Amino acid sequence: MKTAIFTVVLALAVFAVLSFGWEANEKALSEEFTELIHEKEAASETEARECRYFWGECHDHMPCCDWLVCRYKWLITYNICVWNRTFPEK
């Protein structure tokens, strides 16, 4: 009887150690994934755009892309880039 109880307690201790190890590994993987996402976001933010895209706010110092034109829309308080009914050449 004592051997059976000792075996059960020992098995529970082993399972507790294994689950703690898996949890620590999962947290480390989650942290690595979060760091990777932040690095990708930082890299994309540092890229300078040459022109403003569709529905983007535009001014003289922020030109629209070639297939867009800067127009004032009465529902919006600033100028936006809208389609000029042409297609960009590829």
From Swiss-Prot:
Propeptide span(s) = 20-50
For this UniProt entry, the molecular function terms from Gene Ontology, in alphabetical order, are: ion channel inhibitor activity; toxin activity
Q: One GO cellular component from the entry?
A: extracellular region
Q: In which tissues is it expressed?
A: Expressed by the venom gland.
Q: List cystine links.
A: 51-65, 58-70, 64-81
Question: What broad class describes the main subcellular location of this protein?
Answer: secreted
Q: Where in the sequence is the signal peptide annotated?
A: 1-19
Indicate where this protein resides in the cell: Secreted
Pfam families in the cross-refs = Toxin_12
Cite the entry's keywords alphabetically.
Disulfide bond, Ion channel impairing toxin, Knottin, Secreted, Signal, Toxin
- Sorted alphabetically, which InterPro entries does this protein's record hold? Huwentoxin-1
**What role does this protein play?**
Ion channel inhibitor.
Family recorded in the similarity comment: Belongs to the neurotoxin 10 (Hwtx-1) family. 13 (Hntx-13) subfamily.
Instruction: Please give the record's comment on domains.
Output: The presence of a 'disulfide through disulfide knot' structurally defines this protein as a knottin.
Q: What is this protein called?
A: U7-theraphotoxin-Hhn1j
